């Protein structure tokens, strides 16, 4: 292409800016510092609209108060009867995600029945602002208190992965 030939480096004149990556060596935000995984295969059952622990719990100790924690959850859950199942997530005693908090965690719909298993996949970022051990857990309920909701039904596994991200 004649236009490209006209742009040959030999035709450039004057001082060109120099770019150095040396000043970027101190940037560490966004780096994964540690990964912790947890799982549960212990079945828990609910016929109540009161939230209860699902048995899925993970713990991570951030290295800095500026670190973020990426929380990834795959919660095994099933129900029978005309009800809905809700999942919510806690850091210690503080709700950080779930149906009540209005985060992007849903519920099973009324068409799932006869012990057909489904699951919730959840991903969200938390800012614990701590260098002490931080515990995350899921809770579940049976929203209409009819039928039965089960997590880890028949020893099906639920998983939690916690990634510390440099802040």
List each language-model region with its residue ranges.
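Glycine-rich, low-complexity segments
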Residues: 1-43, 167
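Residue-level signal for the start and early helices of compact helical domains
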Residues: 3, 7-10, 15, 27-29, ...
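Terminal beta-strand-rich extracellular "head" domains
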Residues: 39, 43-45, 50, 61-133, ...
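Extended, low-complexity regulatory regions
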Residues: 56-58
């Amino acid at each position: 292409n004649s236009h490209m030939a006209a742009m040959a480096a030999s035709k450039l004149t004057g001082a060109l800016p120099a770019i150095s990556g040396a000043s970027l060596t101190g940037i560490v935000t966004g780096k994964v510092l540690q990964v912790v995984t947890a799982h549960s295969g212990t079945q828990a059952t609910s016929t109540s609209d009161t939230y209860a622990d699902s048995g899925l719990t993970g713990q991570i100790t951030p290295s800095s108060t500026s670190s973020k924690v990426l929380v990834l959850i795959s919660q095994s859950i099933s129900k029978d009867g005309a009800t809905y199942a809700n999942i919510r997530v806690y850091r210690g005693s503080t709700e950080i995600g779930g149906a009540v908090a209005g985060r992007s965690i849903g519920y099973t719909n009324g068409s799932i029945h006869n012990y057909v298993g489904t699951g919730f996949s959840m991903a969200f970022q938390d800012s614990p602002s701590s260098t002490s051990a931080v515990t995350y857990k899921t809770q579940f309920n049976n929203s209409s208190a009819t039928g039965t909701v089960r997590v880890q039904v028949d020893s099906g596994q639920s998983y939690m992965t916690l990634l510390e991200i440099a802040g």
